[in-house]
Design a protein with these regions (language model features):
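A compositional/biophysical signature of low hydrophobicity enriched in polar/charged and small residues
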Residues: 1-380
Length: 380
């Protein structure tokens, strides 16, 4: 992969435009940025070829499922951390894999169809990997914001307003055809409607209508990610905190409005809030926490850590400097090997039968020191 210089201002404006309108044609983007269509296309090709920026999309809801996200901490034995991380990063339902500073080795963010699926993943996938020492999982009860909504914020206000399309929010329940469409788009989010129609055996009109419905209903999350070091955000930090339940809505609304915040999630567990931020320097971590304390004094930060290497971000594998290496389209976890192992455990639980020990065999005696008499058992 070629080495590339850091982003210039036009690069960052292009990224912001694509974060807002990821499928806009180059002519529209060129007019928005005040350059030619060929310039925008050429710029984007250079960024993607260097692994500095990339597009992605993934479903936020699945047909007939109450899917959810879990934040999993993984401890590894010495010398096995990256072996474990690489195996976990290959799992298609895993959004993020991060090597952290502090008391946990890896942080994994993944999606699951139900709680039983999470149990199988912890017990029969992670638990079976050579090098995994321990796992701890917290379930995301509310996702207040996530990284697909983060913006580079490099467009002028007038341009930014012009690029935003206001659409009414409607509740959309996806079906199997929607899932096929979203999975296909995950491989190339700018795939033309005609080619999408050909790959999914749908008409172009149907594809366009479904895409509009999925986007306006927030079923499909579009994202344009960047190599954060090259983009000027070299520090990625994560904070765990506790909030009184009655203050969660007010405090998280403030957090979501802070530019540095990439993820803000309410979770189960003793720390009921998890926040991820991008920062310009380590010094900015203290400044961010100071602002946080002034805005939300009732929030207690219980722990914090810094990313050492984010190996996976939104389904994309990254090098140590945050550049994209390759993509793994996000999809449901293929559970079969783990499910087979779980079924064997269930069968063992179902068929194991150990009769309670006879009092005499167990050495049980009554108040008088004698063994109680049992019906049908003759004294020896």
């Amino acid at each position: 992969m070629p080495r590339s210089a850091e982003f210039d201002e036009l690069d960052l404006q292009l990224v912001t435009a694509l974060q807002t309108t990821p499928r806009a044609d180059w002519h529209h983007l060129g007019r928005l940025l005040g350059v030619s269509a060929s310039t925008t296309a050429r710029r984007w090709a250079r960024l993607t070829e260097a692994g500095l920026a990339w597009l992605g999309c993934h479903p936020l809801r699945l047909p007939g499922m109450q899917a959810f996200a879990a934040i999993i901490e993984v401890d590894t034995v010495p010398g096995k951390l990256y072996t474990v991380a690489a195996q976990v990063a290959d799992d298609p339902h895993v959004f993020d894999v991060i090597h952290l500073s502090g008391s946990r080795d890896l942080l994994v963010v993944a999606g699951f169809a139900d709680h039983a699926s999470l149990a199988r993943y912890l017990g029969f996938r992670l638990g079976s990997l050579d090098g995994v020492l321990a796992t701890r999982a917290q379930i995301a009860t509310t996702i207040h914001t996530e990284s697909s909504r983060w913006r580079a914020d490099r467009l002028l206000p007038a341009r930014s307003t012009a690029s935003a399309v206001s659409t009414p929010r409607i509740r959309v329940e996806p079906d199997a055809t929607d899932l096929l469409l979203m999975t296909t788009l995950g491989q190339d989010p700018r795939l033309p409607v005609v080619e999408l129609a050909d790959r999914t055996d749908l008409s172009p009109t149907t594809v366009a209508r479904r895409l509009s419905r999925l986007t306006s209903g927030r079923v499909l999350a579009w994202r344009c990610d960047v190599a954060r070091v090259a983009a000027g955000w070299p520090v990625s930090a994560h904070l765990w905190g506790w909030l009184p339940q009655e203050r969660v809505r007010q405090v998280t609304a403030q957090l979501v409005g802070m530019r540095e915040v990439r993820m803000c999630v309410s979770t189960t567990g003793p720390s009921n809030l998890f926040v991820s931020v991008w920062l310009r320097s380590m010094r900015d971590l203290e400044a961010f926490q100071a602002r946080l304390a002034s805005r939300a004094p009732e929030l207690t930060v219980t722990d914090r850590a810094v990313s050492l290497w984010q190996l996976k971000l939104g389904g994309r594998l990254l090098d140590p400097e945050g550049r994209r290496l390759r993509s793994i389209p996000l999809s449901l976890w293929p559970e079969q090997p783990a499910a087979d192992t779980q079924n064997a455990v269930v069968d063992r639980l179902r068929h194991s039968h150990h009769a309670p020990p006879h009092p005499e065999d167990a050495g049980i005696r009554g108040p008088d020191g004698r063994q109680p008499k049992q019906p049908g058992r003759k004294p020896g």
